[in-house]
Amino acid sequence: MAASGGEGSRDVRAPGPPPQQPGARPAVRFRDEAFLNFTSMHGVQPIIARIRELSQQQLDVTQVPRLQWFRDVAALEVPTGLPLREFPFAAYLITGNAGSGKSTCVQTLNEVLDCVVTGATRIAAQNMYVKLSGAFLSRPINTIFHEFGFRGNHVQAQLGQHPYTLASSPASLEDLQRRDLTYYWEVILDITKRALAAHGGEDARNEFHALTALEQTLGLGQGALTRLASVTHGALPAFTRSNIIVIDEAGLLGRHLLTTVVYCWWMINALYHTPQYAGRLRPVLVCVGSPTQTASLESTFEHQKLRCSVRQSENVLTYLICNRTLREYTRLSHSWAIFINNKRCVEHEFGNLMKVLEYGLPITEEHMQFVDRFVVPESYITNPANLPGWTRLFSSHKEVSAYMAKLHAYLKVTREGEFVVFTLPVLTFVSVKEFDEYRRLTQQPTLTMEKWITANASRITNYSQSQDQDAGHVRCEVHSKQQLVVARNDITYVLNSQVAVTARLRKMVFGFDGTFRTFEAVLRDDSFVKTQGETSVEFAYRFLSRLMFGGLIHFYNFLQRPGLDATQRTLAYGRLGELTAELLSLRRDAAGASATRAADTSDRSPGERAFNFKHLGPRDGGPDDFPDDDLDVIFAGLDEQQLDVFYCHYALEEPETTAAVHAQFGLLKRAFLGRYLILRELFGEVFESAPFSTYVDNVIFRGCELLTGSPRGGLMSVALQTDNYTLMGYTYTRVFAFAEELRRRHATAGVAEFLEESPLPYIVLRDQHGFMSVVNTNISEFVESIDSTELAMAINADYGISSKLAMTITRSQGLSLDKVAICFTPGNLRLNSAYVAMSRTTSSEFLHMNLNPLRERHERDDVISEHILSALRDPNVVIVY
C-alpha cells in the first residue's frame, strides 16, 4: 500500500516496467489518491471506471426536472393528478455470495470517488462505517432513509392506499416511476411539503450561488469553493455533495424506494441549484447486496384485529435485474459486477455449496450428504446445557423468546458463577388523551390499555429484537398529573453475556477491564484515539492519561502476587524505581536533595508537584512507638523498593493547553510502556495475561450492580450496533449529560420529570477492546397513523440491547459468527433463508442444524437465479474473484 501526494508533491519515481512499446494497449492508471487492495485491483478498476463514466454523463436540457414540477406535486392531495414524468438516473449493481468482499469494495469506491455512502438499515450503515473508518477517519454513515428525508412519523404510514394500474406491458420507465410514487404517496407528499416549506418559496436557495459569486470575485477556478459547500454549510443535505449514492444491503429495500431516492435527489438538487444540477448530471445509484440472500418485507397493522401482518415484496436488486424496462434503461449488463468466492469461510466444499445456493445451480446427492454431517436433534440445540458459547439462530422472534426463557431458567437452577440472571424494569408511557382519540377513530370504545400495549409491543420500541426478550407481565399505573399511563415490565438479562446495542446510543466510557497485554495494545496502535477522538483528540488523550495514572499502581500490585520468583521480584522493584527516577528527573543524592527539590518545585510543571514528607511532625501526647500519621500506617509494611514513588512526586492535574495535554499523555505513556517492558522481560506470559483494570474513579461491583462516586472524567462517545459488547451489570449513578439530554428532548411529555423522580438504571457494557461504559437509556417515540391523523401514542424507555446468545436468521444478516446452531421451521422453509443462516459461520466445523434444508420441501427463487447465471455468461458483466 502506498499513497503519493497531489500536484505539489515531490516527484519520486519507483522502479517500474520497461517503457511501453508503440501500438501496445495503454495501461489503466489510477489517480494518486487511490488506496487499493492490490490482490483484487484488476477486478475493481473497471468498476470504478464505469461508475465514474456514468456520473459524468450530461443530460439534455429538456430531461432535467424543474423545481416548479415539485411545487406542483406538493399542491396535490391525491396522486391521481401526477403527470407522467421521467426522473433520469443510472444504476450499477455490485452483487455476490456471502462474504465475497462486496462491502469491502465500497471502501475503495469511497476513497477514489466522491460519493454518498449509505446503508439500507442502521446495522448495514454502521457496519459500513466500521469498514471505512478502519483505515481512515470517516464521516458518520447514515441509512438511505435518513438521506432522502424519511422521518419518524413516516414509520406508521399506510402504503399502497391508492391503487394503480400500469398502462402497458412492458411498462415505460415513466409509468413505473409514477406507480412507485403513488404507492409511497403519503411519505413522498410529506417529504416534498417539508422541503419546500423550509425553502421559503424562493427560486433557489443561495448557498451555492454565494460560493459561485465568491469564486468569480476572487478569480478562482470553477468549483474551487462550491466543492467545499458541505464544510462551509454543515447542514446541507448529503445529496447536494455528490451524484453517486452507494446503498449497502440494497436487497432489503422495497422496489418503490428506488424511485423515491431518485425523486428526492432531483428535488433536493433543484431546490439548492447545485453545480451538479446546473451541470445536468444525473444520480448514479450503486446498489450493493445479494438478491438471493435478502428479501424486502413490509408490515401492515390491522387496527380492528390488533394484528400485524408481514408480507414479502419485490426488492430493489430483483427489480433492477428482472424488470425488462429497467434492465434495458440502465444497460445492466454493462453496469454489473459479480463477486465470487466466500472469504468468510474458505473451506473448498463449503464454498462450493454456497455457490450452488447463491446461483441456483442443481442440488446433487453429494451436496445433500455434505449438509447431512451438520444435522443434530433439535432437542440437542434447544437444550441450554449443550453448546455453550454458540449462537442459536431461529426463524421467528417467538422461538428466540422461548429459548431465552428456557436459558434463563437453566441458569437460575445451575447458578453458574460467571453467568448470573437479573431483571431490569422497562417503562412505556402512554398518553391518555391520545389513547382515547385512538379508540374513537378505530371505533373500539371497550379497548383496554393492557390489550393495546400487548398487541403493539413490537411496534412501540424502535428495534424488532425487543420481541426476543424474556419479559414478564405488564403492570399499568395511572398518573393523573401527567395524564399518562405507565406500563412497567421486567426484562431478564444474563451477566457477562454477549449483547449488541440496537440503536446509536450515547455512552460514557469510564474505565478499562482486561489484561496488561490488551491495554498495552490500545496504547501502541492508538486505536482508541482513532475511533473515539474524532471530534477532539485532546479529550481522548486526557481520558487515557487518567486511566494510565490510575493503572500504574497495578504493576506493583502484580509483584505482590504469591509464587513469583523472589530474585526476579527484587530486580523488578529496582528497575521500576530507576525508571520512575529517570522519567521524573529525581535526584537521589542526599547532599543536594534540598537544592534539587527547590529547583524541581520551581521548574516542574503543575502536574508534577512533589509531596514533602518532612513537614509531618510527631503528634502531641502520642506514644513513641505509635505511628505519627495515617500515611505511616499505610507505608509501615512496605520497604523503600515496594513503594511506588511515582505517586509521591506526580499529581495528575487538568492541563489547560493542547501542548500540556500531549506532554502529560506522553509522560504517562512512557511510564506505562516502560513498566510493561520491564515486567514482560522478567515474567513473560504470566504478567501479560494478568488481569488489569483501571477507572476514572473508585469502582465497586456488588453482584450485578456497579457502585461509583461519579463517572466524571470519563469520555462521551457513541455505542455502535457493529461493536461487540459484554453485559457487565447496571448502575444507578447519574450521568449529567444523559439527564440533560432527557430533559431537552422529553420535558413537554412529562417523561423527563417521571424518570428523574423514579430513574431507570443505566446498563454497564464492556466493548471488544476492554473499555467499560455506562450507556444512556434508549428512548423511542411511537406515533400511530390512522388515515390522515397522527397520534403521539407512547414513549418507551428501555436499554436498547439484544442478546447474541440467540437471534432470528433475519437479524444475523451481514454478521460473521464463530459457532452457529440453527433451528429451521420445517413447514415454511425458504432456501434463501437457509443460505443466509449457513453462510454466517466462519468454519463449518462449528455448524449445527436441526434438519437438512436441501432434503426438506422448500421454496426456491429460480427466476432471479436464471438471471444471475445468464449474467455470469455475459462477457460485459465484470466478474471479481
From Swiss-Prot:
ATP binds at G96, N97, A98, G99, S100, G101, K102, S103. One of its GO terms (molecular function) is helicase activity. Its EC number is 3.6.4.-. Disulfide bonds: none annotated. GO terms for biological process: DNA replication. Keywords: ATP-binding, DNA replication, Helicase, Host nucleus, Hydrolase, Nucleotide-binding. Pfam families: Herpes_Helicase. It is found in: Host nucleus. SUPFAM superfamilies: P-loop containing nucleoside triphosphate hydrolases (SSF52540). Its main location: host cell. InterPro entries: DNA_helicase_dom, HSV_HELI, P-loop_NTPase. Associates with the primase and the primase-associated factor to form the helicase-primase complex. Belongs to the herpesviridae helicase family. HAMAP family: HSV_HELI. This is DNA replication helicase. It comes from Human herpesvirus 2 (strain HG52). The gene is HELI.
